[in-house]
Amino acid sequence: MKLKKTLTYQNHTYSFLSDNTHEVLENPKEILFVKTPLNEKYSHLIAEKNLAILDFNELKNYFDFKIKIVGITGTNGKTTTASLMYSLLLDLNKKTALLGTRGFFINNERIKEKGLTTPTLLELYSDLEEAVRLKCEYFIMEVSSHAIVQKRIAGLDFALKILTNITSDHLDFHQSIENYRDAKNSFFKDEGLKVINRDETNALFNPVNAHTYALDKKAHLNVQAFSLNPSISASLCYQQDLRDPNFKEIALMHSPLLGRYNLYNILAGVLGVKLLTQLPLETIVPLLENFYGVKGRLEIVHSKPLVVVDFAHTIDGMQQVFESFKNQKITALFGAGGDRDKTKRPEMGAIASYYAHKIILTSDNPRSENEEDIIKDILKGINDSSKVIVEKDRKKAILNALENLKDDEVLLILGKGDENIQIFKDKTIFFSDQEVVKSYYQHLKQG
């Protein structure tokens, strides 16, 4: 990426920064090369021409980000927690930017479409500069485990870091669950302000300036009582000092969101906003009623019968969704991404087999893999094959599920969430789970 930035380095003034060797070699007088862990193997092309190289660790010396950066990481819940905080801060009349899986937003306006959960370092710096230019006070961002390892957040001073949870994901990249956990936990080694899920047993963090939330354990933000039916209601209790039981803030909250795991997301977001703004709980909590969730995250696409679309693509993520509907007859429709961690596929089958009375296995984003091979991997975890239907064409699979769905059942369409493409080996097509469902019921209504 080429970023417009006038700076003087090694007695030469440049007009741009770039992490792309081709761009730099085309115009070396104007563009300064920024070496990062991702492009390091190509940096010899620049060195051979005796051109200047700016190491990514030096980048922060040429930027002055007068903005409070909030980084949210975790296996699940990053997008909802980030979006919830963004919504709360905007409702509190705070100028705020949001960067993550859904794109880049500033003050309720979409600046960029979807991209990586955490962009490249230069793109991130560019987004921060834009937020500063528009006088944002807060910059809320999702931080992926890839970004932590690849140092795509290098040089940023976080006003607050938040951990949602740590289960298992991206083992194709991290190679082991231990490496994955270490990557997540490394984000919380400093003494900066942090919000931690106290119920997360895999969390390791520096206790200095750590504030916690929990449903089960004692924490700074606890739930005294809650109901998940029909949506989330709870009595929240905040204690700034856990050693002083006399000073507490208590507030009743109501949210349109569904599910126990969204209650965790709410706790993380509310505690984060409270620490940033220092406002009373009773000022923040009523604003939760204005946040209706994120498209593709436990999204109700049709109500009678109930059809829900969710992004869940990890074992823990799927279990959380299933738990939200455990008292209903569940039909689970899902696949698994190609060219990704294969070890989780049988476990996905096993968790679906435990909760669902009917399973429809289909394609997700097969990429370079054979769809049938992916489905066979999932089938290894399912003991009772009589409850399984295999239809690799995702559209046909959804239509089949809808045609056979009874009023007392819930159809959970998992894996893709709000994605509107499907990636195959030789092509990428437009595809939306939501559009297939809506189109089906629209045609049904028209007779």
Curated annotation (Swiss-Prot):
Binding site for UDP-N-acetyl-alpha-D-muramoyl-L-alanyl-D-glutamate: T21, T117, T118, S144, Q150, R152
Swiss-Prot/TrEMBL catalytic activity: UDP-N-acetyl-alpha-D-muramoyl-L-alanyl-D-glutamate + meso-2,6-diaminopimelate + ATP = UDP-N-acetyl-alpha-D-muramoyl-L-alanyl-gamma-D-glutamyl-meso-2,6-diaminopimelate + ADP + phosphate + H(+)
Associated pathway: Cell wall biogenesis; peptidoglycan biosynthesis
Entry's EC annotation: 6.3.2.13
Residues binding meso-2,6-diaminopimelate: R340, D364, N365, P366, R367, G415, E419
Entry GO CC: cytoplasm
Residue numbers bearing the N6-carboxylysine modification: K184
Localization per Swiss-Prot or TrEMBL: Cytoplasm
Molecular-function GO terms, alphabetical: ATP binding; magnesium ion binding; tetrahydrofolylpolyglutamate synthase activity; UDP-N-acetylmuramoylalanyl-D-glutamate-2,6-diaminopimelate ligase activity
Keywords per UniProt: ATP-binding, Cell cycle, Cell division, Cell shape, Cell wall biogenesis/degradation, Cytoplasm, Ligase, Magnesium, Nucleotide-binding, Peptidoglycan synthesis
GO biological process: cell division; cell wall organization; peptidoglycan biosynthetic process; regulation of cell shape
Ranges spanned by the short sequence motif Meso-diaminopimelate recognition motif, renumbered to the chain: 364-367
Keyword Metal-binding in annotation: no
Record-linked InterPro entries: Folylpolyglutamate_synth_CS (IPR018109), Mur-like_cat_sf (IPR036565), Mur_ligase_C (IPR004101), Mur_ligase_C_dom_sf (IPR036615), Mur_ligase_cen (IPR013221), UDP-N-AcMur-Glu-dNH2Pim_ligase (IPR005761)
Co-factor requirement: Mg(2+)
Post-translational modification: Carboxylation is probably crucial for Mg(2+) binding and, consequently, for the gamma-phosphate positioning of ATP.
EC class of the enzyme, as a word: ligase
Binding, ATP: G74, T75, N76, G77, K78, T79, T80
Family of the protein in this entry: Belongs to the MurCDEF family. MurE subfamily.
Role: Catalyzes the addition of meso-diaminopimelic acid to the nucleotide precursor UDP-N-acetylmuramoyl-L-alanyl-D-glutamate (UMAG) in the biosynthesis of bacterial cell-wall peptidoglycan.
Protein name per the record: UDP-N-acetylmuramoyl-L-alanyl-D-glutamate--2,6-diaminopimelate ligase
Organism expressing this protein natively: Helicobacter pylori (strain ATCC 700392 / 26695)
Phylogenetic classification of the source organism: Bacteria, Pseudomonadati, Campylobacterota, Epsilonproteobacteria, Campylobacterales
